[in-house]
């Protein structure tokens, strides 16, 4: 990235604490326009905390967070109005149909040709026959398709995804993966949280591996390998199986821990 390019996401000394429990240790992160950045870790690694702090869903205990020039701690509502988010384990409103919810989001986002866009995304996700079914009566996979459609419908400049392919069958996983890669080629930027390492190799320009709220390493997939024969799974097991101190030498300038309190 050129030095003159300002990051779309910039967090300095960002941390989250609940009383004496540190959910996310202080860290710095930058994501620039056109990047597909991924955060990967085992279950319970606090990946979701990472993304919720950046998107204003949680308030950081400390640190400065700017996303698209908006201070996430001071104005989370303005921030959420300007990005796309697919949260983990969140369903569309049970009392709305997919068509109604898509229309609501499209109006909120100022989308042109709303009726046309709603039909396009219902068809794209194979949901045309469920367009007027109450969301509470949809399957988990169908509800996830609705959530993805609401994030895609306005083609946001910056898209945050937390385990986006949960409950999707392989056909729609692949279809969504191809759309996301094209979105980045068209100038979009994506911040992804997942435990599926295959997504890093297929999709990410850069990635970070975290565990117990600590960043163990960050960089390109190739750059994280200490030997060409290493697989990403080898890298993951090596890093997650070691302490944060042992992992220090694998860090990249993209994500770094701040000095801890």
Predicted segment positions?
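Catalytic Walker B motif of ABC-type/P-loop ATPase nucleotide-binding domains
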Residues: 159-163
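Conserved catalytic motifs of ABC-family nucleotide-binding domains
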Residues: 155
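Conserved ABC ATPase signature
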Residues: 134-138
């Amino acid at each position: 990235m050129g030095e003159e390019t300002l990051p779309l996401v910039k967090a300095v000394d960002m941390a989250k604490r609940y009383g004496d429990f540190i959910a996310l240790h202080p860290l710095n992160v930058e994501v620039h326009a056109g990047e597909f950045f991924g955060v990967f870790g085992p279950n319970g690694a606090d990946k979701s905390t990472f993304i919720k702090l950046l998107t204003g869903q949680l308030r950081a205990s400390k640190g400065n967070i700017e996303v698209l020039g908006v201070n996430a701690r001071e104005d989370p509502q303005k921030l959420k109005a300007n990005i796309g988010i697919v949260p983990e384990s969140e369903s569309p409103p049970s009392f709305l149909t997919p068509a109604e919810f898509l229309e609501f989001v499209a109006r909120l986002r100022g989308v042109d040709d709303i009726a046309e866009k709603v039909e396009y995304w219902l068809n794209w996700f194979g949901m045309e026959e469920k367009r007027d079914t109450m969301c509470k009566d949809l399957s988990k996979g169908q509800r996830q398709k609705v959530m993805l459609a609401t994030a895609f419908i306005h083609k946001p400049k910056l898209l945050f995804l937390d385990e986006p392919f949960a409950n999707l069958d392989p056909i729609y996983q692949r279809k969504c993966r191809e759309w996301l890669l094209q979105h980045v080629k068209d100038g979009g930027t994506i911040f992804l949280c997942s435990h599926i390492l295959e997504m890093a190799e297929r999709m990410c320009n850069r990635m970070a591996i975290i565990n117990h709220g600590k960043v163990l390493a960050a960089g390109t997939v190739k750059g994280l390998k200490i030997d060409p024969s290493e697989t990403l799974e080898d890298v993951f097991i090596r890093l997650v199986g070691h302490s944060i101190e042992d992992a220090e030498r694998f860090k990249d300038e993209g994500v770094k821990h701040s000095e801890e309190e």
